[in-house]
Amino acid sequence: PAIIFEMEREAGDQILDVKGLEKTKDGELLFSNIDLNLKKGDKVAVLSKNSLAITEFFEILAGNVEADKGTVAWGVTTNQSHMPLDNTNFFQEDLSLVDWLRQFTKNDEERHEEFVRGFLGRMLFSGDEALKSCKVLSGGEKMRCMFSRMMLQKANVLLLDEPTNHLDLESITTLNNSLSNFKGNILLSSHDHEMLSTVCNRIIELTPTGIIDREMTYDEYLADKKVKELREKMYS
């Protein structure tokens, strides 16, 4: 597959400002007191001992879920593309892959079948493959569709919640390289150690009592004694 993320436009200096974010779900406090200001070029690994906290955080940033407290303000020059952990809702209708991807186009020029097929082709859906129904897709095929959508959107901020799910090794390597080369901002959660280590220059951890926020690599974060002590304190 050819996963290449391009930006329609570059973002200005104001990327994202999060203040006092808090969320409880099913009686469990996922995180609170989350303050975060993203700078241009930040590629952020999002961590938490509770994976639900990460997913809810992404859903709030994407505007799909409301926080219990706090505010999220995106810079006016930003546009976001979100790869959710659960993409089931995207594949409810019985559409061909061409028509499925066409839903996310912005103008008549983009709606042309040739244009849409170009993005599907990058993810190895060519010829008749691009005409099959999105209802019969495997987990891996759905992920490939979601990457086609993400490439088509040409956003300058990528929100990726476990993007390596269902991907083979070759696709993971391709994704890793394209995220490393991406010129915009990234917020990323992943179980792939190498991806977090090679892509991210900043680590945030969401805890019930607040945020740990460090400008360092993932490996440095894991080895940092002060961070370790702080984690023990903030989760207790």
Tell me what each language-model feature is.
Residues 8-236:
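ABC ATP-binding cassette signature C-motif
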Residues 1-9:
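Short, flexible cytosolic linker that couples an ABC transmembrane/permease module to its adjacent nucleotide-binding
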